[in-house]
A protein has these predicted regions:
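Glycine-rich, aromatic-flanked loop segments that form ligand/cofactor-binding clefts
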Residues: 46-51, 89-100, 128-178, 214-216, ...
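Active-site-adjacent "subsite" loops/lids of carbohydrate-active enzymes
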Residues: 47, 53-75, 135, 146, ...
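The substrate-binding groove and active-site-proximal loops of carbohydrate-active enzymes
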Residues: 59-71, 111-127, 180-195, 237-249, ...
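Catalytic domains of carbohydrate-active enzymes, especially glycoside hydrolases
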Residues: 75-102, 207-212, 304, 310-313, ...
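Aromatic-lined substrate-binding rim segments of carbohydrate-active enzymes
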Residues: 94-149, 233-263, 328
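Aromatic- and acidic-residue-enriched segments that line the glycan-binding/catalytic groove
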Residues: 102-117, 152-180, 218-237, 280-292, ...
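Active-site neighborhood of glycoside hydrolase catalytic domains
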Residues: 192-288, 292-317, 323-344, 349-351
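Substrate-binding cleft of secreted/luminal carbohydrate-active enzymes
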Residues: 299-325, 339-426, 438, 442, ...
Length: 448
């Protein structure tokens, strides 16, 4: 293709091409936002992600009890989604694969024990929690993002003997590694593990009308595992074992990005990593912090994923208060804001709503915690590179009436969850139009 495509030599064609792409993107945007009765609920241009995680691991948020009773499971979801709507949230991140399992009908992973009490046991009446949650969220004008934990198989070693017979970890024990506590994980260095995880995510996007596929901050275990046998095959190519481990996680992220968008062009694929990528004292590009960074601790190069454009959004878990010496909230927000600038990758901030309930730190106690969370949200709205927030986790709003009321206050003016186009590198020569990757229909660069 002509490398000068879109330059002044082509007159107004570059502008017309951009308009054409915008029209195409708009055609793809119908699944990004849902309003009751088919009406558009929010004003054009008024976009902000107002998200909340709905955790199912250890039944943190859902279900209220492990049961096969479909009525109980339905009513729990209805109650949760009604409250989320009442608080002004416009997106929910529903954990559907907490531990190598499924809260949906899967041909790959077994039904979750957190749902029915026994891994592999289905709910009554053919009930499918994910399908029901998607329909109910959309009926309330909210996006539904399916949240998976990619590698984790068991949350405690006590669960190891109780895996379902059809669990891929049972059928393929060669793919499993264990950490120092005996918890089981799929080996990130094994290509078959990557294929399994990606196939599982693709199954969700293929079979359900989800708005996004979301992964959280668990990658390599923190320690105590042995992957020497796998590394031996790659040692010549990667003399540095840490670099090899990071390349394995990178491969998962890149493959996931490509596979999901090949199925559904406007799917939103994003990750919620640790709030710290790396400290400046360890990496020149790092933040002015002194906490545990994902780059070295769990081999997750979250900054690199943004720079490479492998994700549609990044949602760092900045779970500290403003002024916290080890990891200042404001410092990290500014650092991540600089990281995403000009990339077309959206930045959402992961907020520690749970600290207003469980923290003993003065900054989070009582009214201080309410004010802290309010300030975070308002400061984010003042930063043009921050496109919203997501709170961990739902049950804390039920435990703390003050932050329930806070959400109603700060979300009193409705906003649409993002899903529109972002034009970056708009120099007419290497334009990239990103609306959750519908620009994949076109080259990333118009150069050959």
């Amino acid at each position: 293709m002509n490398k000068n495509f879109g330059t002044k030599a082509n007159g107004g064609f570059s502008f017309l091409m951009k308009m054409l792409i915008l029209v195409v993107c708009a055609a793809f945007s119908t699944s990004a936002f849902y309003a009751p009765n088919g009406t558009k609920a929010f004003a054009d241009g008024n976009e902000e992600l107002r998200g909340v995680w709905i955790s199912t691991v250890a039944n943190i948020d859902y279900p209220s009890q492990q049961t096969t009773d479909s009525n109980v499971l339905k009513n729990d979801l209805i109650n949760i989604l009604d409250n989320c709507k009442d608080m002004g949230f416009n997106a929910v991140f529903f954990q559907v694969r907490p531990c190598g399992d499924a809260l949906y009908k899967s041909s790959i992973f077994p039904w979750s024990k957190y749902l029915t009490g026994t891994q592999g046991l289905a709910p009554n009446d053919g009930f499918d929690p994910l399908q029901f949650a998607v329909e109910e969220a959309h009926a309330r004008g909210m996006q539904l993002h399916a949240w998976i934990n990619p590698y984790r198989i068991t949350n405690t070693s006590a669960d190891n003997p109780y895996l379902a017979k059809q669990n891929p970890a049972v059928l393929n024990p060669n793919l499993v590694i264990q950490d120092s506590n005996g918890k089981m994980y799929y080996n990130p260095g094994d290509q078959a593990s990557i294929d399994l995880i990606v196939d599982g995510a693709a199954e969700i996007v293929q079979n359900y009308d989800v708005d996004g596929l979301h992964m959280d901050d668990y990658f390599y275990p923190d320690g105590g595992y042995n992957d020497d046998g796998t590394y031996a095959y790659y040692k010549d190519e990667y003399p540095d074992k840490a670099a090899w481990r990071r390349s394995n996680v990178d491969k998962l992220v890149k493959t996931m990005d490509e596979r999901l968008h090949s199925i559904k062009a406007n799917i939103q694929f994003g990750i919620s990593p640790r709030g710290i990528w790396a400290n400046k004292s360890d990496m020149a590009e790092g933040s002015d912090t002194n906490g545990g960074g994902s780059y070295t601790a769990i081999y997750a190069d979250s900054r690199g994923w943004v720079k490479n454009g492998w994700i549609d959004y990044i949602m760092p878990q900045i779970y500290w208060n403003i002024g916290y010496k080890i990891a200042d909230y404001s410092v990290l927000c500014d650092w991540w804001s600089d990281v995403v600038a000009g990339t077309g990758v959206r930045l959402y901030i992961g907020e520690a709503a749970y600290r207003t309930v469980s923290s003993t730190t003065e900054a989070w106690r009582g009214e201080n915690g309410v004010n802290e969370l309010r300030t975070h949200i308002l400061n984010g709205r003042a930063n043009p590179n921050i496109s919203g927030y997501c709170c961990f986790t739902y049950n804390n709003f039920i435990k703390n009436n003050a932050i329930y009321a806070l959400m109603k206050e700060v979300n009193s003016e409705a906003a649409e969850a993002p899903g529109g186009a972002i034009l970056v590198n708009g120099d007419g020569q290497n334009d990239i139009l990103r609306r959750n990757h519908p620009w994949r229909m076109f080259p990333r660069s118009f150069s050959t």
